[in-house]
């Protein structure tokens, strides 16, 4: 993965598939990107979720904050329909799913930690959970 130039697909191929989804990362690979950037925040149950915004409104069928929700609730939301019917039923992935995808496809991944509007307690949990995830 040391070839140059390094082209990063921001939130995956976000102009071709719904951002921050496995579909977007797969599409990035399909069009030749070897690296992608993705955003990580924390859900109410401590799950590390891949999402850019601090609400569900723009990119899912849900609304409001996810800081009080568990991943089982978030996983039920459609994160692709807003983009096109082709991606209906695409889901918000967990960070571990995205890292596993990058590893399996031998792609580089740039993880961006979101500001965590859920407050200091959740922000600390986010950093701790990421450290454990990345160390494991």
Where are the language model's segments positioned?
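Phosphate-group recognition and catalysis centered on beta-loop-alpha active-site segments
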Residues: 1-136
């Amino acid at each position: 993965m040391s070839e140059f130039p390094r082209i990063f697909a921001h939130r995956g191929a976000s102009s071709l598939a719904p951002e921050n989804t496995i579909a977007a990362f797969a599409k990035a690979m399909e069009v030749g990107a070897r690296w992608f950037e993705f955003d990580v925040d924390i859900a109410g149950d401590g799950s590390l979720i891949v999402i850019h915004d601090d609400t569900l409104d723009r990119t899912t069928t849900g609304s409001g904050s996810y800081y009080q929700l568990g991943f089982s609730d978030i996983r039920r939301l459609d994160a692709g329909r807003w983009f096109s019917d082709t991606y209906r039923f695409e889901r918000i992935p967990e960070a571990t799913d995205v890292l596993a995808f990058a590893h399996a496809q031998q792609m580089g991944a740039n993880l961006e930690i979101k500001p965590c509007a859920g407050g200091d307690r959740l922000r600390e949990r986010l950093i701790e959970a990421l450290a454990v995830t990345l160390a494991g």
